[in-house]
Amino acid sequence: LSIRRQRQMCIRDRRRREIHKGDCGRILIAAGSKGMAGAAVLSARAAFRAGSGLVQVAIPVELFPIVQTGIPEATCLERDFSKIDLSRYDAAAIGPGFGKGEESVKFVKAIIENFMGPLVIDADGLNIVAEQCLFEVLRARKKGSTVITPHMGEAKRLLGENLSNRKEIIERLIKKTGAVTVLKGHETLVATEESQTYINTTGNPGMATAGSGDVLTGVITSLLGQRKPDGSRISAKEAALCGVYIHGRAGNLAAEAIGEYGLTAGDLAYYTAIAIKKILE
């Protein structure tokens, strides 16, 4: 099925006049490491552009100045699991630019085991799952509460096989992880254990740029943390479908404005808000 048909699944109503930032979602993004602080900035920026009310970024203390300068709307937390109250968050993401050191491994495992809300796992978060064989821990999470967003390289590492058929890959990833799966690439695929596979029709070659996946992680996590006008939460499947569509639509709007060759992940984050505005028109 084409994701285009699902584009207004979770962005279909204007916000209530009496809404407050708590209604718009409090999310945690665990991202960034030495030399990769930009991943945290891009994910957090995209989350705000997608509508989050509050975004907190868990990063190494030495990165605080970079991240707080790059995204002043976000607040920074020391990446120490014992100091983070997970009950405060409506949704969380882990992995962009995260690193794979010993402390990173412990943090990823702790988040997967202890965070009860919807969780997006990307990049190094997925690499750690693959290298540490955390599949049982992942499958033990509440059904429908996890979204994974691998590109083909990460997908092959998760499966431990060099496959090329994307339909087969996404089906095997779902079986192995139990997660809503977003297989990134040209015509990104989204699927769950219960659903058909959806194909995204938005996007362009200009989005093949560093940080594009970090932006997608921020968008999906943001949607997971928000409420619909009736007060209900957006499901992981809805957030993945809508997030992928918005991400591609933002890329198309950016390409229309500046062309594909010079498009950056920062442009994708900026145009995320405009993409949502277009959906609401």
What are these regions (language model features)?
Residues R5-Q8, R12-L119, N127-V147, M152, ...:
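Small-residue (G/A/S/T)-rich helix-start motifs and N-terminal tracts that mark the onset
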